[in-house]
């Protein structure tokens, strides 16, 4: 769009792509330490030209890359395969090493090249679309209300790791934390989830010389119940948390599956007109 462009999995980041039979296929080496940066950047440049041909694009550019995290430890769940594969590569190369030595080497190699890919991608975006404001979706991560960290505060290790990602944040004009809430949480927990994530993003921003803006990704359905729109109370309280804790704005996100039928379109239109729209206007006027 003219105001905001979201680039989903752009370029050719190294990744292990899941196949229908349960196996994985290597894309550009599979993991950062085996990837070809030139191939990736060439493809990323082509993707930019295709999606945003206007070199004077002055809007917001969001790079939405979620195949793996640049912090080795944080690759769990869907991204854990990259961690396991990296460990196996070192084990194959050094069969006599201890497990701790193998993991340390895998961590070092992975994080070195993960940084290379993510940093050079940002730099190329900024070089070719100088007027746009760039950043990666989801960062900084907080991991509050997760199985290993069930409270409102961000995971202590993740906060230290966020400080280690200053190389990324120094190249971003905007931070894009995700504040999607879950139905399984209590109303108060939903508020605290948003509060914790905004506070961490603002903390990171305040620690940087150029103080990037904090624009939160907010979804109008519950992450674990995608057929239920956020209640009026949840809309009001989550918006208020973003504003009162130092957030600079909100990106209201939606999935194509939210509008893939006539009945869904009608439901969303009604929700926008009666619930979300009026409150969004109210918050905008208050902030301005």
Curated annotation (Swiss-Prot):
Miscellaneous field: On the 2D-gel the determined pI of this protein is: 9.5, its MW is: 44.1 kDa.
Disulfide linkage: 142-154
Organism: Polybia paulista
Active site: 66
UniProt-listed Gene3D superfamilies: Aldolase class I (3.20.20.70)
Record-level GO BP terms: carbohydrate metabolic process; defense response; hyaluronan catabolic process
Signal peptide limits: none
Broad class of the protein's primary localization: secreted
Localisation per UniProt entry: Secreted
EC number(s) per entry: 3.2.1.35
Catalytic activity: Random hydrolysis of (1->4)-linkages between N-acetyl-beta-D-glucosamine and D-glucuronate residues in hyaluronate
GO MF annotation terms: hyalurononglucosaminidase activity
An example Gene Ontology CC term for this record: extracellular region
The family this protein is said to belong to: Belongs to the glycosyl hydrolase 56 family.
Glycosylation sites per record: 36, 282
InterPro entries (UniProt xref): Aldolase_TIM (IPR013785), Glycoside_hydrolase_SF (IPR017853), Hyaluronidase (IPR018155), Venom_Hyaluronidase (IPR001329)
PANTHER family: HYALURONIDASE (PTHR11769:SF35)
Protein name: Hyaluronidase
Enzyme class: hydrolase
